A protein has these predicted regions:
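Low-complexity, Ser/Thr/Pro/Gly-enriched N-terminal "stalk/linker" regions
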Residues: 2-58, 78-86, 90-103, 160, ...
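Well-ordered alpha-helical segments within folded domains of soluble proteins
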Residues: 3-5, 55-73, 81, 118-135, ...
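Extended ligand-binding clefts on enzyme/binding-domain cores
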Residues: 19, 23, 150, 157-169, ...
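Carbohydrate-binding/catalytic loop surfaces
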Residues: 37-55, 100-122, 164-190, 234-255, ...
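Extended ligand-binding groove/face enriched in aromatic
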Residues: 78-190, 194-196
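Conserved small/polar residues in nucleotide/adenosyl-binding loops
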Residues: 335-342
């Protein structure tokens, strides 16, 4: 049961729906499509200047595909499905590596590969997006692509000796020295962030593809979080590891903490293991409670904290606020937590 005033919930729904339908979705539908070269523009400035010659990334295209597929499922607006189809066609026509499998990380503005390595984070986002597109329109090849990518992750990125998934591989699925997702990340081969999005993708795919191998993989990655990534003393996430699961980081990411709380709970529910469901429900509440320490009641959730330096990065990034909305709502379904209302008002 959700412990929040019904009138507040109704007002919140109205506000969120207005923001989504009058601002967020029209922004991407109006400014982002690259009508000259296909797909979507790789860069839009803060002043809404569209750079049609910027490189194009798979993660952005996958996120657009997922978003407009999900929007179509709720509102049944043909324009949303048309936007999703544009993303789907560009991913299949340009990002898909038909020789080696997987998807390219980055293309130039004309659609030619620039960065061809296999970033497992990107493969996970593509699975997530393809599955949602299948939900939206029943495109069988989209679901087949998601299943194929799952198989490639399991074949090439799973560490069968020590468990966990390798961060990145070459185009031909060979080891690479620099596996970083971005320049600010630690160059370590097993990261919480990539595992979190594999968890998200496998959860979505398992809803519609009840394959025993996928069930086993989803069960395994849930347990990697409960046993490896979540610190049971602090209830924060451990973020970077080497191949042998030696911890290589000591900072706190509040956005990832609250994101993990609800994604893990959702995954356990989809898997259908009662014991794991109960455990992950308790974890979700505990992680949400601890997450309040990063919540500024005037300005929202801070970004990171570095215990060794007793220093906080108090920048407000958009995505931790969005994850906090979902994560706190999820925790509220178990208990009488109230801090979620502060975040909702701030966002």
């Amino acid at each position: 049961m959700l412990h929040m005033d019904a009138k507040k919930l109704g007002a919140l729904r109205t506000d969120l729906e207005r923001e989504l339908k009058e601002n967020i979705l029209p922004f991407w539908m109006t400014l982002a499509p690259d009508k000259e070269h296909g797909g979507f523009a790789g860069y839009i400035s803060h002043q809404n200047h569209v750079d049609l010659k910027a490189n194009k990334g798979i993660v952005m295209h996958a996120r657009i595909l997922w978003t407009f597929s999900a929007a179509y499922l709720v509102y049944h607006d043909p324009a949303y499905l048309e936007t999703a189809a544009r993303a789907y066609e560009y991913i299949t026509g340009h990002f898909t590596d038909r020789e080696s499998g997987g998807v390219y990380w980055e293309l130039n503005y004309r659609g030619a590969p620039v960065t061809m390595r296999k970033q497992v984070y990107a493969l996970a986002f593509t699975i997530y997006a393809m599955t949602e597109y299948w939900h939206a329109c029943g495109e069988k090849e989209a679901l087949a692509s998601a299943v194929r990518l799952f198989g490639e992750i399991e074949e090439h990125a799973l560490d069968r000796e020590r468990n966990g998934y390798i961060e990145a591989l070459s185009r031909e699925w060979e080891p690479v020295e620099d596996v970083r997702l971005s320049v600010k990340d630690a160059n370590e081969r097993k990261t919480m962030n990539t595992h979190l999005h594999i968890l998200e993708a496998y959860t979505s795919l398992f809803r519609v593809h009840r394959d025993p191998r996928l069930r086993e993989a989803l069960d395994n990655i849930i347990r990697l979080f409960t046993e490896r990534f979540i610190d049971r003393e602090t209830w924060h996430l451990r973020l970077f590891f080497d191949d042998d699961w030696n911890l290589r980081s000591d900072f706190i990411s509040f956005g990832h903490d609250i994101e993990c709380s609800w994604l893990l709970d959702e995954a356990a529910g989809v898997l259908g293991n009662r014991e794991l469901e109960e455990e992950c429900g308790r974890i979700a509440v505990q992680m949400a409670r601890v997450n309040f320490r990063g919540l500024d009641h005037e300005h929202g959730l801070i970004y990171e904290f570095f215990p060794g330096e007793n220093r906080a990065d108090t920048d407000r990034h958009w995505w931790p606020q969005a994850e906090a909305m979902v994560g706190y709502f999820n925790a509220v379904s178990y208990t009488h937590l109230r801090a979620h209302e502060t975040v909702l008002d701030l966002v």
